[in-house]
Amino acid sequence: MSRPVLVTTEFRGVFFGYADDTTGDNVTLVNARNCIYWPATNGGFAGLASEGPAKGARIGAKVDKIDLRKVTSVTEVTSAAVKAWEAANVYRG
């Protein structure tokens, strides 16, 4: 069963989505979004997992599926953070 996770990569990518298998260096996410920027008030990437994107965060559009390579961490996402990720507006510059 897919669970909500925040994934970081060696290339400094930060992604939210739903994963079945998070073992190994590669992770596939569905209904995924990336975090382009987060403000200091987010408290780092762990804050993105515990609280979701704060005001001022820049969140990319949702994609159906993404395969991430060279994964450095997988963090469980709280239900409150899931709601914030799902509600975040798409940053368009």
Descriptions of predicted regions:
Residues 1-93:
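Conserved RNA-binding domains used in RNP assembly and mRNA/RNA metabolism
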